[in-house]
Amino acid sequence: MPKRRDILAIVLIVLPWTLLITVWHQSTLAPLLAVHKDEGSDPRRETPPGADPREYCMSDRDIVEVVRTEYVYTRPPPWSDTLPTIHVVTPTYSRPVQKAELTRMANTLLHVPNLHWLVVEDAPRRTPLTARLLRDTGLNYTHLHVETPRNYKLRGDARDPRIPRGTMQRNLALRWLRETFPRNSSQPGVVYFADDDNPYSLELFQKVTRRVSVWPVAFVGGLRYEAPRVNGAGKVVGWKTVFDPHRPFAIDMAGFAVNLRLILQRSQAYFKLRGVKGGYQESSLLRELVTLNDLEPKAANCTKILVWHTRTEKPVLVNEGKKGFTDPSVEI
């Protein structure tokens, strides 16, 4: 039987060690416990006075969802009653890179307020690929189609150079606009012919036109860029181009935009299908709408490049073989 003196000695030895171990555990675990407590507690209880509680009750996942909602699902920007509608006319046709190019273009147009995308397919009917893509973009769009007649084509996919690709599709878009809006419509708008293989600066869509606006286009005519020639008074007096500079309007299709009212009032104005030399398609329309003196130079008096006439390299698919190596049902 241990004596009282021995028990007291044991207590006096063990007690200090117990206290030391307890203090050490508390100092080590306290921060970790505090973190777990904060994660499990309701943050709204610690909201500073006067602050919005919603700002203090979001996890990282909540923040990601908010950013995604704000940035993606509110595109395109809200419609404005003070801005004109920009009608972007885009001819397109089936090819391996069609979806890629339309996707790239849609990603630009999603940032433009008051935009209406008029997509016209060179096809006997609207294709599911284009229909799905347009629906999924969230853009305001109209989906049309008209097939270029076979007698306007050469063998294979090569076309008669006198009938440039997209002519009939652009004309159908012009007809749609005239059938949709009355001739004396007060609807403010701009019509721009934008091919699906070009990159466009967002600044381009901020240029409002009274009649016909013009600007340079890069990588056309064998030059770094072609541009209207502007004098010191800010008037277009000619064209900086090598190919047939004496054309009435020596300008690329991507280098001008037309006021909607002008399109509606001049119902005879279309792109000519026959009797038009190569490079004169733009002139065949513009000469029915304006004179050289009516043109409005934009893009810092036509000294700034806002659109590039690029072409996507045709993909080499030799390894697909005649039967196809990959699953043809996978949409590219």
From Swiss-Prot:
GO biological process assignments: carbohydrate metabolic process; chondroitin sulfate proteoglycan biosynthetic process; protein glycosylation
Domain of life: Eukaryota
Region (Interaction with galactose moiety of substrate glycoprotein): 243-252
A matching Pfam family: Glyco_transf_43
Topological domain ranges for the Lumenal compartment: 28-332
Cofactor annotation: Mn(2+)
Pathways involved: Protein modification; protein glycosylation
Keywords on record: Glycoprotein, Golgi apparatus, Manganese, Membrane, Metal-binding, Phosphoprotein, Secreted, Signal-anchor, Transferase, Transmembrane, Transmembrane helix
Record-marked site positions (Interaction with galactose moiety of substrate glycoprotein): E226, N319
Residues with attached carbohydrate: N140, N184, N301
Protein name (record): Galactosylgalactosylxylosylprotein 3-beta-glucuronosyltransferase 1
Taxonomic lineage: Eukaryota, Metazoa, Chordata, Craniata, Vertebrata
